[in-house]
Amino acid sequence: MRSIVIHGHFYQPPRDDPWTGAIPLEPNAAPFHDWNERIERECYARVAASLASMSFDFGPTLLEWMEQHAPGTYAAVVAAGRAGGAVAMPYHHLILPLSARRDKVTEVRWGIADFRRRFGREPEGMWLPETAVDDDTLDVLAAAGIRFTILAPHQVQRAPEGGLPGWYRTGGGRRIAVFIYDGAISHDVAFGPLVRDAVAWVERLTATPNRLVAVATDGETYGHHHKEGDVVLARVLETLARRDDVRVESFATFLARHQPEEEVRLVAPSSWSCPHGVERWRAECGCRAAPERATQQRWRAPLRAALDWLSGELHAVFERQGRALPPELERQALRMFTSCGWFFDDIAGIESVIVLRSAARAIELAGAEAPRLEAGLLERLALAPSNDPSVGSGRELYLTRVKR
């Protein structure tokens, strides 16, 4: 019998002010207060009833917001996850191949701890932010007890036949299962016609001879990116459930019955959303949200270098003076690497401002070291040019829109 897994990656960047914990009014989310509220109404509340039949992950920071502001939807997500379909995610949405080993370990451990607290069990799988992967990242996952992850077809040199998972053996001698989702079907759900046509979607899923057909998209595809996408998803799941020739299940249940038989080799570093590996989060690789606009992304490398420098300094300060400093310093030092800060087209965008606010808050919490750290950060941000002449560089952006 053919197995089908439909995975949704549900995530929003942390929008809360790192000083107050509250999300400022976001006028472009009207008639809602902010984008979290709007997307919860358009997507999360509507797709919750389908989660029990899916594989899914929710970003821990999104669940933290949902627990406080959408408790009904949160309860439905937790109930579905406890039934077995949920997989974990690192605590923040960092590009792990660009992170130091200690930060990878921290993010994975925090993600597992958050999952355990919410879902009452150990996670078997973990979704990687942007599916960004390298050998060290998978070694950290395997060392933490994670049994599998999910990657795009172009992230392995050769996928096992039949849609089956493969073993990956890390440089550290550990082993982890890797599922490869169907790239063509997933693309046509996320960006093409299938999310509007349940009949065509079911036909595509059942036409392949593969023993496993896995689809993976952003969860916001269903209702937010595509109005009524949640309705089509529900129809697809209901139709498949009535058939006796397919089994709709999770990656974990499939893995319990079918251990990998082949080994896979990574294309690394790589991700699902940048054909240049992970360059979108550290360089002007050509990837941008609005390719029709003639913008530069020369700011990405200086922003990454500035925060890498600050991270090293903050970790050193915390290790020397940890007992005298609040642990919140370390949380903000990780949160400032949220991937959205580099994903879009200009350093003056709200996503980059958010990561710089976390950097500013971490500096503030460093006590007597704060003036030195801020001066060093500003020196490096001066090398990050905005596309907006009225903004100038990252230095001016920090001083006018970030610093308190």
Task: List where the protein language model places each region.
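Catalytic domains of cell-wall/extracellular-matrix polysaccharide-remodeling enzymes
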Residues: 117-161, 221-236
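Short, well-structured secondary-structure segments
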Residues: 3-8, 12-102, 106-107, 124-128, ...
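Acidic, His- and aromatic-enriched active-site or binding-groove loops in soluble protein domains
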Residues: 73-86, 109, 121, 142-177, ...
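A general structural detector for well-ordered alpha-helical segments in enzyme core domains, enriched
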Residues: 73-76, 107, 111-114, 137, ...
